[in-house]
C-alpha cells in the first residue's frame, strides 16, 4: 500500500473529525466511548489518549483512503484493457478494507457500534461536513481564485445536508420503533424477492422467499 497524497494538518483534522466523532465543535458518542482493550496477557489497558490510539486512527484513515483509491484504479485499468491489473486492484482494495476494519474495531472496544450509535455518528459527521468543513474549504478556494472548486465544495456540502437529514429521520424511526411498523396501513416490500404486503406491520417472515422481517421496507413509488 502507498500514499501519494500530501495530507496537511487541515485535512487530517477534517478526516479525524468526520471519522472519529467530533462534529459541529462538539464531541459525539464515539469520542466519548472508553477504549479499554485486553492485551495478550489478559490485562485491560486504557487506549484513549495514547500514541497508539493516534496511530490506529492514522492507520484507519490511510487504509480507508487506499481502499477507495484502488477501486478507482481498478476501474481505470479495466477501461484501458488491463483486466488482470484491474482485478488485482480490486482484490487489494478488499484487503485494505479489512485492514481498516481491524483498526476501526480496536478504536471502538473491539466491535462495530450499534446501528443507533452509528446513525448518530453519521448524522453528526454529515453535519460537520456541510456546516463547517465544506463551507471553510469553499471560502478558502474562492479566496485563492479557484471558483470552480469552491462551487463544487458548496454543492457537495448541500448534498451532505440531505444526508444528515436522512440519517436523522432513520435514527428517529429506530428510536421510536417504527422501522417495521406504523399506525396506519402501509405498503411493505420484501427487498429480496419483491413480495408486497399491505398492513400496519411488516411480516416476521416473507411468505414467498422466507427471508426475515429485516428485508422489508416501505415501498416508494417515485417513478
Residue ranges and their predicted role:
Residues 31-32, 211:
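Intrinsic-disorder/low-complexity coil detector
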Residues 6, 10-19, 29-30, 36-41:
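Short, positively charged and aromatic/hydrophobic N-terminal segments
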Residues 44-223:
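Non-heme di-metal
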Amino acid at each position: 500500500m502507498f500514499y501519494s497524497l500530501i495530507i496537511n494538518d487541515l485535512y487530517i483534522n477534517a478526516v479525524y473529525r468526520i471519522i472519529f466523532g467530533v462534529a459541529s465543535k462538539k464531541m459525539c458518542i464515539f469520542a466519548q466511548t472508553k477504549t479499554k482493550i485486553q492485551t495478550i496477557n489478559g490485562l485491560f489497558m486504557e487506549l484513549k489518549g495514547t500514541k497508539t490510539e493516534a496511530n490506529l486512527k492514522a492507520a484507519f484513515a490511510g487504509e480507508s483512503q487506499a481502499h477507495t483509491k484502488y477501486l478507482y484504479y481498478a476501474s481505470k485499468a479495466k477501461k484501458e484493457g488491463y483486466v488482470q491489473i484491474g482485478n488485482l486492484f480490486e482484490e487489494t482494495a478488499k484487503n485494505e478494507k479489512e485492514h481498516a476494519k481491524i483498526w476501526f474495531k480496536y478504536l471502538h472496544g473491539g466491535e462495530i457500534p450499534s446501528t443507533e450509535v452509528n446513525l448518530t455518528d453519521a448524522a453528526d459527521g454529515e453535519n460537520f461536513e456541510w456546516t463547517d468543513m465544506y463551507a471553510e474549504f469553499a471560502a478558502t478556494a474562492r479566496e485563492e481564485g479557484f471558483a470552480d472548486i469552491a462551487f463544487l465544495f458548496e454543492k457537495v456540502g448541500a448534498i451532505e445536508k440531505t444526508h444528515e437529514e436522512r440519517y436523522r429521520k432513520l435514527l428517529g424511526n429506530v428510536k421510536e420503533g417504527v422501522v417495521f411498523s406504523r399506525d396506519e396501513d402501509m405498503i411493505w416490500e420484501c427487498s429480496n424477492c419483491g413480495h408486497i404486503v399491505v398492513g400496519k406491520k411488516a411480516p416476521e417472515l416473507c411468505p414467498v422467499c422466507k427471508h426475515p422481517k429485516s428485508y422489508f421496507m416501505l415501498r416508494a413509488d417515485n417513478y
